[in-house]
Amino acid sequence: SPTSVWLIPRSPAILAAASTVISPPTAMAADSATADNAPSVAGHAYNELPYNNPDVTVTQIDNSALPSYMRNPIGQNEGIDTPNDLSQNYYSADASALSYDGKLFVFTGHDEASPDYGSFNMKDWGVYVTDEDGLNQGKWTHYKTIAKADLFSWATGDGAYAGQVVADDNGTPSDTSDDWFYYYVPVKDKASEAAGQDPFAIGVAKSKSPLGPWKDAIGKPLLTTSQTQIETIDPAFFVDEDGTGYLHFGTFGTQLAIKMKKDATTGRTSYTETETKADGTTPNLHTMKDADNNANGPKGFFEAAWVFRKGDTYYNVYDGGKPGSGTATCVESNYQACIQYSTSDSPLGPWKYQGVIVPSGSATTMHPSVLQFGDKWYVTYHTGDKEGGTDFRRAVCIDEVDWTADGQMTSTAHPTKAEKTQPSTNVASYAKVSATFTETPAYKGSVNDGRVLQTIVVPPNHWTNYRSIPQPQSGDSLVYQWDGTVRANSSKVWFDVDSNALRAPASWKIQYLDADGTWKDVTSPSGYTTTTGKANPNTVTFDAVTTTALKLDMTGQAVDGGYASVAVAEWEVGAADSESPAITAPKGVTTATGTAPTLPATVDVKYGDTTVASPVIWRPVAASSYAKAGSFKAYGVVAGVPGEASEQGNVSVNVTVQDGYKPAADTTKPT
């Protein structure tokens, strides 16, 4: 199967929100635009920043009408009324955050791939800006096209992958007039490309304003792939408390770092010169190792390192993935990523693995940055969850980071798929998915993620049972297992095909798990059609069943003495909503101060004369909610009970937080 062998070298609406294009009166004439005379953004409101960059256009983003947990992605409604205009319908990726002058800058790349394009099309960068009040309200200003890849004369003008902007205060933090900004970006080097080499290199641009215009700071690449011997992308710049600057970068399981030169008199870091070996030209590179010193990066590292210091500890946050150094257990497919982190007592490692901050999302990468803004800490990343999004049309998100007393990080990551956190008659998203077989790069979890793409551009966008062409097995099954009980009377299945191995099934059926543990066919099915494609779901209705599991059983078409493979992009299960389900409020729970509450996995739902214990998805509970004694409400959504979108979902539970609370011992007799 062609989907099982390729890898991509890269770094990588419930309610409407307003998006309005404006041209601030502070914009200067194009003929006066230079990096040296760019007006300072200090002292200006985030939505009225002055600039003299003729390429910049501005959009105001207001997500305040959305429930707070649904404000991701930041630009989720930006330009969706003009879907084919990618200057307005903006897809952003590879976020890197900067706190400057009381404002939060989230710099991004710009995805311009068509919906069916299976690679990256990136040529410029933009930035979302807000302040503390704006962040709390979901309000941002988007300054688009602050820089283009062709600003470097030695670059091809594309490959505008993940970059980072840092501010240099010139040793005078109270005086913003002499501040400079440096933009570290990967671009494609013309000379390397002409020589048939991996073209990626890191360039560094500078400007008096984070909105540009920018100029090449050194007139050549800072680092090239021929120098580093790895694809030189994903730069992350960090200045330690002693004034030493470090540039981390790397991908495909290898993370490198290099120290920047320091001024012998001031002790301040250079932003444009790296340390070299004794010959004066060869970069003095450091290979990151995990705590066991047996890999070319921290455990599970794939790419997108972000290094910072908090107290005496250095934190290395990165995309974890299976192609990485070691095994990232947070993902199933080679084409997925989660956000992991490791720690060290040195910015050059070795790195001790700590865990996952944000679980795997809906894009092949996530590309994190972590920083303190005001009194809180935040993590930025991207997903494919904007309307029309794919793995190559991504959108940037931001969530709060919580810290434990011993310096561990967790994120109250708000799901970006509304289907899972809003009342709905589709109960599929509440189920755990299993399969009799899954092709290695495919992902069985894609079938209940709420996304039906026009084109499957990477393997995790669907589930397939591909083994060979043809294959000896006649068919396979997908199974939904719920923690509680659901009452369902319909299913909708999207089958996928390709020009090679994947065909519509010859036949399929829905089965349910009976109370005695036996699989049985649903009764009175309306019919099992076998159409394919996004616009052609196959819907079947049947007599309502009360069950904890459903099976989608498929038989492949007979071909060449064997059977064709089948693929499923999405499988929905419809609750028996016509029976007007009613929820019984759950009993309150108690937890100890500082301990996350254990919320009930199910609540009772009455369907006519039948009562079932239905599963619940609880909305994320911030650590601050149980940090001290008191009480609060947790909100969630019960499977299969429809309703309007709301902050509160359709069920709540009272949580009491007590100092020194200890739960009673479990005296239930094992069954």
Predicted regions and their residues:
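Sec-dependent signal peptide cleavage junction
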Residues: I14-D36
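Beta-rich carbohydrate-recognition and catalytic domains
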Residues: D36-A160, A167-I230, V239-P298, R309-Y314, ...
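Serine/threonine-rich, repeat-prone extracellular segments and beta-strand-based repeat modules
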Residues: D609-G649
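Disordered, acidic Ser/Thr/Pro-rich linker "stalks" and the adjacent N-terminal cap
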Residues: E419-G484, D496-R503, P525, T530, ...
